[in-house]
């Protein structure tokens, strides 16, 4: 069985030049069989920089900027180690980045459709991944505001029961599960992936993304709208 952990970057509201231009979903999938050793290596990485205390969570933005707990360590070295970990561990990455302004200008949907589209896109790609591997999977999401979690669960249940525009979801089982990011290694890694996508799409800096871009494969990352299509 494969476990897909997902986390969002940015807000889904209409772009007004004061909020985030992109809404991004980052995803990290790993097999239940690979989970124990992957988790152990992840804990070893954290212990390398915090040998005397248990690091509750790698919060990517704080790590990248050397803030909070990360101001007393070589945070750039830790960023490099996390990138290498993602690039070399038995992980498959997923990413959906929606340019909210262009999404509306091109008539691809209404403001409230941004979340729907991003979730549908990442579910489609996870389903294809499971079909190709002849496996089943579950999805675990970072817990956020209660009302937003309810919206995501309602959307997910609709897709699971009725299918997406392209697939009947025969390989994804049960409901979507929510847990705080500090309790799940996979969500922290998904946060890192989402942040790398944000740096690439918003800031024009692909230095993080490029280090593990191969882990997305050919079809698991999508920018919406596709800038190469008119």
Spans of features found by a protein language model:
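Phosphate-ester processing/binding pockets and catalytic centers
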Residues: 1-230
């Amino acid at each position: 069985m494969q476990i897909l952990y997902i986390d969002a970057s940015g807000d889904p509201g209409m772009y007004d030049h004061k909020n985030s231009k992109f809404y991004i979903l980052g995803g990290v999938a790993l097999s239940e069989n690979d989970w124990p050793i992957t988790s152990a290596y992840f804990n070893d990485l954290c212990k390398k920089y915090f040998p005397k205390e248990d690091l509750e969570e790698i919060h990517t933005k704080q790590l990248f900027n050397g803030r909070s707990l990360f101001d007393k360590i070589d945070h750039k070295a830790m960023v490099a180690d996390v990138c290498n970990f993602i690039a070399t561990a038995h992980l498959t990455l997923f990413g959906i980045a929606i340019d909210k302004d262009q999404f509306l200008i091109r008539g691809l949907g209404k403001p409230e459709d941004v979340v729907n589209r991003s979730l549908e896109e990442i579910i489609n790609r996870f389903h294809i991944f499971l079909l190709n591997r002849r496996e089943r999977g579950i999805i675990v999401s970072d817990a956020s505001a209660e009302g937003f979690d309810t919206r995501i669960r309602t959307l997910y249940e609709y897709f699971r029961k009725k299918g997406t525009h392209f697939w009947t979801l025969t390989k994804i089982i049960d409901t979507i599960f929510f847990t705080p990011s500090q309790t799940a290694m996979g969500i922290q890694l998904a946060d890192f992936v989402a942040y790398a996508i944000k740096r690439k799409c918003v800031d024009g800096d692909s230095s993080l993304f490029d280090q593990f871009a191969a882990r997305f494969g050919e079809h698991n990352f999508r920018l919406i709208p596709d800038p190469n299509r008119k």
